Structure formats: structure tokens, C-alpha cells
């Protein structure tokens, strides 16, 4: 937290409270600040990105990246194999790509300019421009952990330029042959890349057992609410895994098929823990597993996914033209709203001293509840600050412009402090080096 600016709580157009100026831990189920804003953050971005692309004439497919697992596998190992390892400067750990990253690299995918038969690769033949992805984790006493990635893959785009200079020039309908080639490659490559990442991995039996499964196709007629909830237009399922039941006409939401008995979304675990700790008998509480089992699983999950969330991969910008209007809120031309341009209704500034008092009395969540909604409850905030032994004078209502200006100043201050810290660490390292003669 910046001691000069304190903490800023901004209220979005949807009424959600967003904390600015706080170093967040990313533990969305143990931290009231992170839990309050994480669910609301990606929904607007995902909806706008997908609907904008469909309205331009592009195509979107729902794809699931999954991996075989056993009860003996640790969640962190499975997620590293699927998503890759994170870089850690303190431990010297380097970033290592996982099975997901390897699916979108290589000559077969990206093309080979030296070969006339594969100049553009699968990526060019389907018009791939990017994807939006999020990780879901299920767990069971028998089958153990099962992390998998749900992705919305955006295809059907014509582009020009290379890498950072790539621009979207139009849209087209990918051929059935190109889509089949893409699907087959991801099915074949998934198990193989997982095996390379995790020596103990054993590919599933069966020629059609997937490392990636194609799901429903979203169409230009898909509404914003449908995209947000994952529902598709009835009867418009385009491609589906052969090992799963085909939804018939009128199918709405697509439930995961083939989940083993006793396997549930790990996010249901806290509810069962609360019931069991409150005295509800095991057979009556929702979910499964003993209290000790649930606590152990939740601790492992919370550690393994700290800071994880939805990812929007970089998308090419539209090509400039006299009749092309930039979509409001785009960042570098991407059909994703810039968070710094988010339309804030208003906000409130809480000075350093008052915020420390609120945190000391565990009133973080109460502050979020007072900010979010149709309007900021300054009376409730004032009472909270006074209950923490501080003055109401440490609160200030902010206009949308003031929120943006303060946030920009916070970012500049953070960048400046990071530079100073890097210089300080470099100087300390130089002093610690032994003198050589």
C-alpha cells in the first residue's frame, strides 16, 4: 500500500468494488479483498472479447485441455505438466512450458516458410487469433485431482504482418478439413506433450482419447448473457468429443460428462468444511470426504493455484483503415477492455492510518460490502472507521476522474519504487561479491 495515497476502492459500472493500491496475495478464498474482486474482474472482459469477435464475423470454439491422473498425483505437479512452471527469481527456477503451450508452438502449428506445403500452418488455415482460458479443478477421494483448462478459441481471422506487428484484416469461415486437422493435432499432441513434461504420465488407451476436446461453437447470434454463463444457442453444437454424448436440439448448458462418482468441483469444498465444522453430520453435508480430508485438499489447492485466474492471450490488432473505428476500451487494438479505462462510477479513498485500523479489526470484507452496490454507503464506512478507533476525516469520496488520476499516480509510484529496489539489490549484490586479486 502507498502510505501517501492509502487505499482506493473504485466502484465499476456493474456495482463491483475494486481495490486499487493494494499488494494482493491472490488467495481468493482466504483473503476478503481478493475474493471480493476476482469473480467480477474477468466476466466483462470475456464477454466483450467474444461478442465483439463474433459480431465482426469471426468464430469461437469451446475447448477443454485435460490430462489423465491418479489419486497419487499432486495437484502442483499436474498443473505444472498442463500449464508449465512459473519463473521464480528467488529460487532460480526458470519458466518451463507445459502441454498447453506446446500445442500452440512448432512448425505444424505455426507453419514453415521453407516448405511450400506448410507455409501458414494449422494456425493460418483456421485463422487463429488467440484464446481466453481459465483453469478448473475437480477432486475426489478415489480419482484424486483433475485440473483442466477451459478455453474459448477465436478463429476465422485474416491477418497480415508478423508477431507484434500482426493486424486483423478481415474474417472468413474455416474449412471443415482445416478444423478437423486442428482438432486431430491437438488430440494427438496433448498426451504426448504431457508425457514429456511428466515422466510418470501414461497416455489413456483408445485412438480418440483426447488431450484436448472440442466443444460447442459460439455463433454471432450468441448473446452477452449466454457467453457469460457458458450457454449456447439451442441446437448449435458444431463439434463434440466422440466419447461424449451428443447434445440434441434444444440443449442449453453443457454439463461435464463422464465425471467419476464422488468427483466434485474443488470450490465446493469450503461449504462442506463449514457444514462439518458447524456440526452437520457427514452424510447430510453436501459433497464428500471427512473434515480432515477436506482441509488437507483445500490447503493443497489454495497453495497450488495462488494468483491463478482467467487469461486473455494477446490478440492481433485490427488493420487501420479510413472506415474502421476503434472499439471503445480496446488495448492496443485488442477486443478486450483496458482495465485502466474501465468506466468507474465513483470511488472512495481510505488513508493509510484508517486502513491499518480496519485491517487490524478484520473489517476488510465489511469495507467491500459498503462500497459495492448501487451507491457507496459513506455512513457505513464512517461507522467502520470509527469502530477501528479512527476518524471519518480519513475517508474521501472520489469522482471517476479522480479515481483514474490517483490510480495512474499509484502505477507511476510503483514503477519508480521497483526501479529503486532493483538498483538497491544490484548494489548489495556487488558489495557482497568477494574481491578478486
From Swiss-Prot:
It comes from Streptomyces cyanogenus. Transmembrane segments: none annotated. This is Neomycin resistance protein. The keyword Transcription does not apply. Belongs to the Gram-positive plasmids replication protein type 1 family. GO terms for biological process: response to antibiotic. Keywords: Antibiotic resistance, Plasmid. The lineage of its organism: Bacteria, Bacillati, Actinomycetota, Actinomycetes, Kitasatosporales. The keyword Calcium does not apply. Residues 324-338 have a biased composition (Basic residues).
